[in-house]
């Protein structure tokens, strides 16, 4: 019940909720969400939303199916203060490690809420955090962090804090993760960071919270995939590429080395550059720039005319 919330806010109408979700990504029934910008008002039409935290200026614009309403000048702050408080009540289930799994004595596996499947290998100095499921035949090399703290930052006056990660990580069968990679845990309870079957990460790759990688995705060294991205099957992410948050990359697409991806990439397309565009278009633009530069360089020097 909303009336049981012990964070500073103004209860307008009480209501019940089962999950906490961002308004543009509702996946469960009876969801509590927050609204801090008018452009997201249409998202409140989702019938799975039962309660909302919003600014007083949105009074009268809330759909009738939303039973619970809280007013606050900072809805995001109230939402994540509550989210962090809910995290203290998460059930702890003892960790289960298959007898055929090989765990380095120098690795750390959380004592609760971890599952490690048959024949999986956990190397030295690996940290496996709570909420992690590692399926069969997975190999995680030295120095990796699985279930790392994500980077959902929230401002509280002059201070800031990070939202607790209450979601999960799922590493599917046949995945191999090379040295010193970080895979962040999902933030909200229904968020799961996923590495699909037979996906391979090279050294020093970062996978942000809640991102979902499909099957057989290849991510070479130094690439960064920000939070809540969706990457299709058989995608190639090039060396030192950066993928911004909430980006969708379609099946079989390729991101060239060093590219910065800020827009969705259709299936089968290759993108290149900073900011990344279609590879053929990038090469056309590059050739035009080179020809223009050559033309300037080959121009005869101006003649110094004397009277």
Question: For the regions a protein language model found, what residue spans apply to each?
Answer:
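Structural signal for interior beta-strand "rungs" in well-ordered beta-sheet cores
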Residues: 34, 96-278
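Terminal amphipathic alpha-helical/low-complexity segments used for targeting or macromolecular assembly
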Residues: 1-100, 137, 143-144, 148-162, ...
């Amino acid at each position: 019940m909303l009336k049981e919330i012990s964070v500073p806010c103004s209860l307008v109408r009480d209501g019940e909720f089962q999950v906490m979700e961002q308004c543009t990504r509702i996946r469960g029934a009876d969801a509590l969400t927050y609204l801090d910008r008018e452009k997201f008002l249409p998202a409140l039409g989702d019938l799975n939303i039962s309660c909302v935290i919003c600014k007083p200026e949105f009074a009268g614009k809330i759909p009738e199916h939303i039973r619970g309403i809280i007013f606050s000048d900072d809805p995001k702050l109230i939402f994540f203060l509550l989210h962090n408080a809910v995290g203290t009540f998460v059930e702890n289930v003892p960790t289960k490690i298959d007898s055929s799994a090989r765990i380095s004595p120098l690795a750390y596996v959380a004592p609760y809420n971890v599952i490690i499947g048959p024949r999986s290998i956990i190397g030295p100095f690996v940290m496996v955090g709570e909420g992690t499921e590692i399926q069969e035949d997975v190999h995680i090399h030295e120095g990796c962090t699985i279930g790392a703290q994500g980077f959902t930052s929230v401002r509280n006056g002059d201070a800031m804090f990070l939202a607790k990660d209450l979601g999960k990580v799922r590493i599917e069968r046949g995945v191999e993760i090379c040295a010193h990679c970080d895979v962040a845990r999902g933030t909200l309870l229904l968020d799961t960071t996923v590495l699909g079957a037979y996906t391979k990460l090279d050294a020093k790759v970062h996978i942000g919270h809640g991102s979902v990688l499909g099957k057989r995705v290849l991510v070479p060294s130094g690439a960064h995939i920000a939070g809540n991205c969706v990457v299709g099957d058989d995608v190639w992410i090039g060396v030192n590429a950066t993928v911004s948050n909430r980006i969708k990359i379609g099946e079989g697409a390729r991101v060239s080395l060093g590219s910065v991806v800020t827009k969705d990439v259709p299936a089968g397309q290759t993108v290149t550059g900073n900011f990344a565009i279609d590879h053929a278009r990038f090469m056309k633009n590059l050739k035009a720039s080179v020809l223009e530069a050559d033309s300037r360089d080959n121009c005869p020097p101006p003649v110094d005319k004397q009277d």
